[in-house]
């Protein structure tokens, strides 16, 4: 919005030409989201407290968590509002990728909001059933995947529609452009063609998997939001490179027209995340809830797909991956041993993995900060793939 306004007025006020620069708008988007989050945070927390939207704490978990019972949850609304306002203010409204990421983010946020609402208002600890939640995640993920399959390699929605029609008329068979290949990090010009079906399946798995992985990681004060900020910021750097015909050519990446605008969204997400951390740091004044975790995870996955960095997301988001794998291993091993020995056995003291470390004697703040440090290292490895190829 401000970009269009500045372009309209820049002939009379030349200083407004600075708004045309993507990097300037990215910085302003970050600061705008940060200020909105910090300013609105106390009011949001107060309202959530008045509405008695409190977190229920499981008694089977670490006993130190019992004092958190009743802490306001659904604070992810603050993050999403900050991101949405800042992005709309500073982005180019004509950019199709911005709207795809925004719709996925808000769509997954809506799923999380319904889940949280049922838990805290109806006092139903189950919230949405797994089947219902998975259905809506799948629907949104597949719609985004189908659109992105034809959008990543094209420069306009008209070209996207033409490519889609070619796919349909060709009997659902189409040679996808090079830009839609799966990029292998650390190897120069090594990529694998996915085809339309492969692209859709991979995109779906990345978006849904990332959403659920971030949600599983959200279990301690401040644990998940800093990795989201770090990974989101790094993906913003990839978006800037892929969207630039100069930098993408120099660094041997495919040029994806319009991808650079995602730097605005990623910057806003980082700013909103830091603002939320101000209130979510131990001892937390508010929890994110599914409304925030599902949305932010879906956003990371969608951005990673657009900038063709699915594998790099897997690396930088290693904490999310390990947390998810720990749950899968725990459940699988429990079922196997119950069938074989008549009673279920556990690989970890408790899953996800952060609870295992807590029950092993680590303090909550130690787990959180150490997971942050690991994420910082993984993000640096991910960023190194920009040049080390």
UniProtKB/Swiss-Prot annotation:
GO cellular component assignments: plasma membrane
Membrane topology: Multi-pass membrane protein
InterPro entries: Glycosyl_transferase_4, PNAcMuramoyl-5peptid_Trfase, PNAcMuramoyl-5peptid_Trfase_CS
Transmembrane segments: 25-45, 74-94, 97-117, 134-154, 190-210, 222-242, 259-279, 286-306, 311-331, 366-386
Keyword Metal-binding in annotation: yes
UniProt pathway annotation: Cell wall biogenesis; peptidoglycan biosynthesis
E.C. designation(s): 2.7.8.13
Record's keyword terms, sorted: Cell cycle, Cell division, Cell inner membrane, Cell membrane, Cell shape, Cell wall biogenesis/degradation, Magnesium, Membrane, Metal-binding, Peptidoglycan synthesis, Transferase, Transmembrane, Transmembrane helix
Catalytic activity: UDP-N-acetyl-alpha-D-muramoyl-L-alanyl-gamma-D-glutamyl-meso-2,6-diaminopimeloyl-D-alanyl-D-alanine + di-trans,octa-cis-undecaprenyl phosphate = di-trans,octa-cis-undecaprenyl diphospho-N-acetyl-alpha-D-muramoyl-L-alanyl-D-glutamyl-meso-2,6-diaminopimeloyl-D-alanyl-D-alanine + UMP
Pfam families documented for this protein: Glycos_transf_4 (PF00953), MraY_sig1 (PF10555)
Domain of life, source organism: Bacteria
Keyword field contains Amino-acid biosynthesis: no
Localization of this protein: Cell inner membrane
Cofactor: Mg(2+)
Example of a GO MF term: metal ion binding
Any one Gene Ontology BP term: cell division
Function: Catalyzes the initial step of the lipid cycle reactions in the biosynthesis of the cell wall peptidoglycan: transfers peptidoglycan precursor phospho-MurNAc-pentapeptide from UDP-MurNAc-pentapeptide onto the lipid carrier undecaprenyl phosphate, yielding undecaprenyl-pyrophosphoryl-MurNAc-pentapeptide, known as lipid I.
Stored NCBIfam families: mraY (TIGR00445)
The family this protein is said to belong to: Belongs to the glycosyltransferase 4 family. MraY subfamily.
UniProt cross-references to HAMAP family, sorted A to Z: MraY (MF_00038)
This protein's name: Phospho-N-acetylmuramoyl-pentapeptide-transferase
Organism in which the protein naturally occurs: Cupriavidus pinatubonensis (strain JMP 134 / LMG 1197)
Lineage: Bacteria, Pseudomonadati, Pseudomonadota, Betaproteobacteria, Burkholderiales
Protein's gene: mraY
